[in-house]
Amino acid sequence: METEKIIRLSVRNLVEFILKEGDIDNRISGTLDKDAMLMGGRLHRKIQRMMGSNYQAEVSLKLQLPCDGFQLKLEGRADGILLESEKTIIDEIKGVVRSLDRVEHPVPVHLAQAKCYAYIYARQQGLKQISVQMTYCNLDTEDVKRFREEYTFEELEKWFLDLVHQYERWAKLQIEWEKRRDALIHQTKFPFAYREGQFELAASVYRTIYYKKKLFIQASTGTGKTMAVLYPAVKAIGEGLGDKLFYLTAKTITRTVAEQAFSILEEKGLAFRSITLTAKEKICFCEETECNPDACPYAKGHFDRVNDAVYDMLEKQKKLTRESIERQAEDFHVCPFELSLDLSEWADGVICDYNYVFDPTAHLKRFFADNVSGDYLFLIDEAHNLVERGRDMYSASIYKEDILEVKNLLKDRDKKLVKSLESVNKLMLEMKRECENYRLVESVSPFAIKLMNLLTQMERYLEEERNAGHAEQPDAFMELFFQVRQFLEIHELLDENYIQYTELEGNGRFKIKLFCVNPAENLNHYLKLGNSTIFFSATLLPIDYYKQLLSVEKDDYAVYAESKFPQKNRKILIGSEASTKYTQRGTEMYRKIAEYLRITVDGKNGNYIAFFPSYQFMEDVLEEFEKRSSGVELVIQSQFMSENQREEFLEMFEEERDHPMLGFCVMGGVFSEGIDLTHDRLIGVIVVGTGIPQVCNDREIVKNYFDQRGMRGFDYAYLYPGMNKVLQSAGRVIRTEDDRGIILLLDDRFQNRQYQQLFPREWKEYEVCGRKEIKEKMEEFWKNR
């Protein structure tokens, strides 16, 4: 007998999905949504503590309900349950910035959420009647206003079952799709002949998902890692080991690789709804991304129409491409970005940036806001990027100068807000006087308390301005508003993985920073909501470093997948006469490096790229190169290139030419990873320097943090991030088994064991040479083609 499908859903998602209506208006929801701040926040807890011993706070509630052809498993958390003499009251707490006199009745969605909790609790406890209490608290005055309504169980059941009934047509549509999808997954074969080691890699991925573990994969170019990870994950979904996969990337170009892999599988007969989430600014129909009904016609009435747009796409099994989503948004007159987010709930695979899952200020609330776990599979591509991205996402700063700027903007407009800004500024001034360069601080809690008051005043001011018809506010005000809110959200996360410090920057700006040195714990908060995680990259070395900073588990799996490209197709040389140490820099060294470049490109006509540690270093070498080389076509990366300029740069490598072309690029930039220049489009890469980051306070804090814990602080702060840039840059050449190419490493430090032990296994054959020897080494390599 076939087991009934179980659909898991949070109470919040059910209510918001079925009962959504009205306009998109980020002047309200984008600025005044306090749920994230209140959850676990000071005021929330204060109200709960005041309710006495008969009050149970944060009560987890679950209900599995038989429906037409499936079981609905609902999960949620009631803010509180109050047991009075003969009454049971479900309490839902919401913070507001407007005067409580203007709160005349509960917000329908808030009330519906509380009624769901009341029904679940009454059903489980056998209660004939139960009360629902909506507690609204003004965030400025901390005054409280309550609305209480009593319901019989029969009333609640009728209302609740009607809500579920509205959801049933969606669930049945999804179940039918999944039956078809799973049948075709079972029939879909691996789309290529397995390369050597590729089957074993795919088997490792499937095994990891089966046992609900994490896997770290170091897979060099040529292992076919994308398909070896994606195919077994899709198979696992067909076997019921997951119901949605998130393919997470750091860069747009990597998302294209994932899309191509899905397309290849679909050509082999797979039916799998995959969607790529495009940034709001890129997919927006309007010139300015202003999400409110006054500025955007698609925002007006969006929630009244969007469910019809979603259902139509699902029912007609339209592909969820950017183009089809934009057409559907036009047809139904809805926001294309919000439509794509709604469609992601019904997709089998979501391709998106890291921040949609991990960023506490930008994650997809529909999946990750309520701490409700799901059968998610996380496939994290180019996972070496997640360390720095994680640090950025979980860190926050406030600048004194930004506080002053907003204070001066508003000095004649709102006394209470200006007073709060002055209070914050005064405390920052005291901290600035104690700081020469940077200073570690034991606790910034007194500062955070002042920021809480400031945020409340800013929200009150926004509310009053909007009611007076002045919705638009200066950019400086809104930027500070979001910075303050982010700072307070990050402050809630503080633990032993953080360092708090003040810094007086070289330009005179003073900041207070919450710096997340080790993001593993925060990342794990989201990863534990899924079943399994696969971290993979061509440069995940040393793997223990990444395990330390990306995971908190001690029993994670790890695999090294070696490239099977012929060793004879790769020539690795270390230039013994080059150095990028600061003490060695100068015209003479730039001249030597320029000569290495000239000899390399003279060895064979074709396309080359040289990667440098900085734009300034690149320009210094370029100046010397241009003095000594003619007949070499140059293409140069510039700072702040637009997407069109990047495309034009890469198109230069498509042309056939009878002379050498040399690209001048920066390590760690847009062209040092993710680009795929196969065959003769690129035949040589020169990496200038070890990639070691410049010394700065953040780096020194990382170094000292790990030194104090008995780990190799210099390696964690400088060596490993630097060598990752080197490996990524070098990986731009030799992309297929037929490619041949040169990798020239220009820094005498590459001769040291400290650096060579971080070389991938494929680099075991290398030669050290000066400028005199390099020419014959090149000639010999190209002659033996």
Where are these regions (language model features)?
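Metal-dependent nuclease catalytic cores that hydrolyze phosphodiester bonds in DNA/RNA
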Residues: 1-86
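A contiguous, basic/glycine-rich beta-loop/short-helix subdomain that forms a polymer-engagement track
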Residues: 325-350, 361-368, 461-579, 584, ...
